[in-house]
Amino acid sequence: HLGLDAWAGFPGAAPDENAGRPGDDGRFRLGVTHAPYRRVLDAMTADGADLLLAGHTHGGQVCVPFLGALVTNCDLPRRQASGVSTWTAAGRTVPLEVSAGLGTAPSAPVRFACRPEAVVLDLVPRG
């Protein structure tokens, strides 16, 4: 945490002259959000994020075998409720990891066909 968490692109956020500024300086840019709403993923991708990380969906929490998640608790497509996929916005496509997490929603304290997970990502330099 570098004190750059007041992302200027989020509605109602306090402006931060360093946050949300795309660049071509070769630095790796990580976009992290609790809930993967499309507008947030779109804005982070447009702002230059190289990798997007999110949670909130609990992997759908209740899944149907061979069909997948029934809900995502946001506007993310159900097929992206957990795991690695890609997100395309503003002419860019970046990896998206949505963790199913360990817990459940307070309103529905149950999981079915949706294993809890703690994700470990190994990031290696390109090249």
Name these PLM-found stretches.
Residues L30, P36-V119:
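Conserved beta-sheet core of the metallophosphoesterase superfamily
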Residues G3-D5, A100-L102, P125:
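A mature extracytoplasmic/lumenal domain signature
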Residues L121-G127:
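Short beta-strand-to-coil "C-cap" segments at the C-terminal boundary of structured domains/repeats
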Residues H1-D42, A108-R115:
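Binuclear metal-dependent hydrolase catalytic cores centered on His/Asp/Glu-rich metal-binding motifs
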